[in-house]
């Protein structure tokens, strides 16, 4: 699994506002791919981003024309280490060169090519170069890789979709109605967004989606979570406190299986909201229904978003926390809750990072954090771990957006502090080390 973290302040990142469609754009460009441009001469460009994101879109040529001057550019607001290709027509022949911008020139990028030269579907991976720098391509400044042919192919491959975040746009219907499918190794479930809200949008999960309607009622789907009986109209995904063009800070962390969306709807970094959709690290062998959906419970931003809250196993449920099915794999959507190292935290129903140990710990100068677990509330059953999300065992020990590197059992992992509502703080894991 590969994870990537994108912030609103990154170069070329999309803008989140209190206007319709803005969250659809953010998720398109973070969960799938930000930009895909084709060119035959590095002067005129064709924007193939929409086609590249969509499973059902119109296939496009990998190279606009079958000449050595043709290039395909793939860009993201931050560095990335993979691109997955689904081909409509496989290539025949050709030699391809991958390159990145090192600050002064396009330089060869050594890749592991899972497509075998675009003769099959697959993922191309690489180690992120230390000298990788942003540059402008078609007036968009961000991190780019480019693909060109030193020997032109006999058959130019055509591409159904390409994804960097690992997800794909599975369906497209009316404007601002969208659905994305989880990627490789996941349950393959659907995140369905009703993106026509202003300050907030509504969302549900589906196990399968056949037809995307202009409203939730128009969808042809199975396995909705939460069900309409549990939560009519879907959970609330907050964008902004005002229905206008004011840009709001946000952070997206995404792997093939799960994504986090943090939105600072007031631009104050004190009462921000957090949203999660995807597969947890399940403790059940063969679990096919461990996909969660956590967001807000009412139209009021912040106060009813409980993503940072923890409870004791068997204690009261957390609002707007759902999973597709219980551990028996039977039935429909269930309510879930989260817990962590409550003994050190000093309470059994406290937002993470809102109390606990002295920081730094006076004995060893340590910053303590704990894994977050997901449990089924009806029978006090621990289902698994929540990837990428950690609980500080101190009272807001760090400044918002501070970063740090773990030690001991957490060596090699990096983290970012995120301030939330009710004096809470959570740690987002920013390295490609999520538990899966």
Tell me what each language-model feature is:
Residues 1-13, 146-155:
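Short, low-complexity N-terminal tether/leader segments at secretion or assembly junctions of large
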């Amino acid at each position: 699994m590969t994870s990537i973290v994108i912030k609103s302040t990154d170069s070329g990142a999309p803008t989140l506002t209190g206007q319709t469609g803005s969250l659809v754009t953010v998720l398109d460009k973070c969960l799938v791919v930000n930009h895909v441009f084709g060119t035959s001469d590095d002067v005129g460009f064709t924007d193939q981003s929409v086609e590249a994101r969509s499973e059902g879109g119109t296939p496009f040529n990998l190279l606009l024309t079958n000449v050595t001057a043709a290039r395909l550019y793939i860009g993201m607001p931050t560095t990335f280490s993979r691109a997955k290709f689904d081909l409509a027509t496989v290539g025949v022949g050709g030699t391809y060169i991958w390159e990145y911008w090192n600050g002064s020139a396009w330089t060869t990028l050594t890749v592991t090519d899972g497509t075998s030269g675009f003769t099959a579907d697959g993922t191309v991976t690489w180690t992120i170069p230390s000298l990788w720098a942003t540059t402008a391509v078609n007036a968009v400044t961000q991190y780019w890789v480019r693909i060109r042919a030193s020997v032109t192919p006999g058959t130019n491959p055509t591409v159904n979709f390409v994804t960097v975040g690992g997800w794909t746009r599975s369906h497209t219907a009316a404007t601002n109605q969208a659905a994305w499918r989880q990627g490789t190794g996941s349950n393959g479930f659907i995140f369905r967004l009703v993106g026509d809200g202003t300050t907030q949008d509504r969302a549900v999960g589906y196990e399968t989606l056949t037809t995307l309607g202009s409203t939730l009622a128009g969808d042809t789907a199975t396995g909705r979570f939460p069900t309409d009986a549990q939560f009519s109209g879907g959970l609330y995904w907050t964008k902004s406190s005002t229905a206008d063009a004011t840009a709001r800070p946000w952070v997206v962390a995404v792997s093939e299986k799960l994504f986090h969306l943090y939105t600072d709807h007031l631009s104050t970094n004190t009462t921000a909201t957090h949203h999660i959709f995807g597969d947890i690290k399940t403790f059940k062998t063969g679990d096919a229904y461990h996909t969660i959906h956590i967001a807000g419970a009412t139209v009021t931003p912040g106060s009813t978003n409980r993503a940072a809250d923890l409870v004791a196993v068997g204690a009261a449920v957390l609002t707007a926390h759902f999973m597709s099915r219980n551990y028996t794999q039977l039935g429909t959507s269930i309510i879930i809750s989260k817990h962590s190292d409550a003994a050190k935290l000093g309470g059994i129903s406290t937002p993470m990072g809102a109390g606990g140990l002295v920081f730094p710990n006076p004995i060893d100068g340590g910053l303590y954090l704990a894994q977050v677990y997901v449990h089924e509330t009806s029978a006090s059953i621990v289902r698994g771990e929540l990837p990428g999300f950690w609980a500080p065992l101190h009272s807001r020990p760090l400044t918002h957006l501070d970063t740090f590197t773990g030690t001991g059992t957490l060596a090699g992992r990096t983290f970012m502090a995120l301030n939330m509502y009710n004096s809470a703080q959570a740690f987002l894991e920013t390295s490609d080390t999520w538990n899966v």
